[in-house]
Each structure stands twice: as structure tokens, then as C-alpha cells.
């Protein structure tokens, strides 16, 4: 590893560790991840202790209005760099794990603790390990939407 690569890697890891514990789910935490190279849109919310791709943050895109829950993990590579995209107004629940080469569709919801190994269609709720679709979203789970309104507009998909 070159000296520049080592310094860049150290900077990335230091910023990652600060971001995990920093206050400001819509401000400082987001800014620190941007400094690391994560592509982050407007109005993004990143929860406490979320881990966003430790080695190649530039392979992660989080679009406008998306949220990443507390202690969620986003992995953009295993052996090959594949990337992860979280589309507009998508919500990744607490403790969820997003694996490489996955896109979380616009307005979709990944429930707490789910492991997502395949891309998720827009406006879909997924759950489990591996995550499977369980419902269609009627209104995205944005910060200004009540849980009551969100849940009333869900359409279950039936037996999984």
C-alpha cells in the first residue's frame, strides 16, 4: 500500500469512527460521511452507530430524503466492488444489513434487523434474513409522515 493510500485509509477510518458517535443525524453525522466520500443527497437522516462501508465509502449512494437506522450496516464490497444505492425516501431500519450490489428502491422500507441480499423494488417493505417483500408502501415513511398514516396505507402481499 502506498503512503497516500495509507493516509487516505486512516482518514476514512477516523472519520467513520467519529461519525458513528457524532451528534446530528441530519447534520454533523451526514457531513462526516460526505467527507469520507459517501454520496449523500439532501434531507438524509443517519442514525447513531450506523456503519457505512468502511473501505470504499465512494461506492455508497444515499439519495434525498432517505434514512439509515441506528446500528444499520451498509457493505458495498466483499471481494469485488459492487456498490449500494439507497433511493429517495427509502428507509433502512435499525440493525439492518445491506449487502453489496443492492439498490433499495424509492420509498421502500427495510425492517429492523433484516439482511438485504437482493435489490428491493420501489415502494416495497422487506423483512427477514434474507429479506423478502411483505407489503407495498402507500406513502413513503418520511420524517413528516406519522407511523399511523404509514401503516394505514400499507398493502400486505399475502403469504410469503
Predicted regions and their residues:
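Structural signal for interior beta-strand "rungs" in well-ordered beta-sheet cores
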Residues: 33-34, 38-40, 44-127, 131-133
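Terminal amphipathic alpha-helical/low-complexity segments used for targeting or macromolecular assembly
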Residues: 1-37, 42-43, 107, 124, ...
